Regions:
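Alpha/beta-hydrolase active-site loop
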Residues: 77-98
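Short alpha-helix in the alpha/beta-hydrolase fold that links the catalytic acid
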Residues: 226-236
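Conserved alpha/beta-hydrolase
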Residues: 40-42, 47-73
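N-terminal cap/lid segment of alpha/beta-hydrolase-fold proteins
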Residues: 1-21
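Alpha/beta-hydrolase-fold enzymes
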Residues: 107-195
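Short beta-strand/loop motif that positions the catalytic acidic residue
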Residues: 210, 216-218
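Catalytic active-site module of serine/aspartate enzymes centered on a nucleophile-bearing elbow/loop
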Residues: 246-284
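Active-site glycine-rich loops that stabilize anionic/oxyanionic intermediates
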Residues: 35-38
Length: 284
């Protein structure tokens, strides 16, 4: 299947690429948000497999990556607020036009899961469900050993990148990719505080507001997903019906860990498809 890239216009005029995989029928539709530093094309196989099982999938390219025309620099800055206020609503608007009457799930991998959680609290009536994939909050105290040290180190040096080179050099740091320093300074606040709030926002992830279904999939061999961090990521969804699943070699073979699962996601797609089918029929 060729990559069917659609371009939509966000509320601030930015062009947002969507990888669109339309299925036949009226199955639940998924809008998937990538992890930090990950291009949307990584999730092509997952989207194709879900499409083959009757569920339309759109994967939203994150600003600054892949087919996005933006590249972070001194003159090109964006933040989590841009994704939440402009990009996600525009993508959902587009999906509602493409799939009228279908239930829509918002989900994401790692950072994409956090954004899904926040948006679900803001607009719970728009969504039938929320999906977390390898989604664990980055609060440094929820991690042991070298992962804790890495997070603390990144928090220490992050402000320096505002001075030079004007963006976060993830390739150099071995974590993430080239990212907007504005967004990463917000991520830094998450790391230090353990709260979803940032930049003066309070109760940004409205606790208990979303009361629908949540599927949280964790993967064995994921060093960036301790149980404490997973539960912190789910904490705003206290009013929801949360299903927790951990996939290992039996479901995923050798494709495990924080990112590698997406390269051959057969077990993951089967798990998600079963859950989406339940949403379509109202069984959960």
């Amino acid at each position: 299947m060729n990559d069917p890239i659609q371009e939509i216009t966000a509320g601030d005029g930015t062009t947002i690429p969507l990888y669109w995989y339309p299925a036949t029928g009226t199955g639940t539709v998924l809008l998937l948000l990538p992890a930090l530093g990950i291009q949307a094309k990584l999730y092509r196989r997952l989207a194709e497999q879900l499409c083959d099982r009757g569920h339309s999938v759109a994967v939203m390219e994150q600003r600054g990556h892949g087919n996005s025309a933006l590249r972070p620099s001194y003159s090109c800055q964006f933040s989590l607020d841009d994704l939440l206020e402009f990009d996600i609503p525009a993508a959902l608007d587009w999906l509602e036009l493409q799939s009228p009457g279908c239930k829509i799930v918002l989900g994401g991998h790692s950072l994409g899961g956090h954004l899904s959680t926040i948006y679900a609290g803001r607009a719970p009536s728009r969504l039938a469900g929320v999906l977390h994939l390898a989604c664990a909050f980055p609060h440094y105290l929820d991690y042991p050993g070298k992962e804790r040290l890495l997070l603390r180190f990144l928090c220490t040096v992050m402000p320096l990148f505002k001075l030079a080179p004007g963006y976060y050099p993830g390739g150099l740091m071995g974590f993430g990719s080239r990212e907007s320093i504005g967004m990463m300074m917000q991520w830094r606040q998450w790391c230090l505080s353990g709260s979803f709030d940032y930049d003066g926002h309070t109760n940004i992830a409205v606790a208990g507001a979303f009361t629908g279904s949540v599927l949280a999939i964790a993967f064995e061999q994921d060093n960036f997903a301790t149980q404490a961090a997973i539960e912190r990521a789910l904490s705003p969804l206290s009013g929801a019906n949360v299903s927790r699943v951990s996939l290992g070699a039996e479901e995923q073979g050798e494709y495990l860990g924080h990112v590698n699962w997406a390269r051959s996601p057969e077990g993951t797609s089967a798990c998600i498809a079963q859950w989406l089918a339940g949403l379509s029929t109202g069984s959960h």
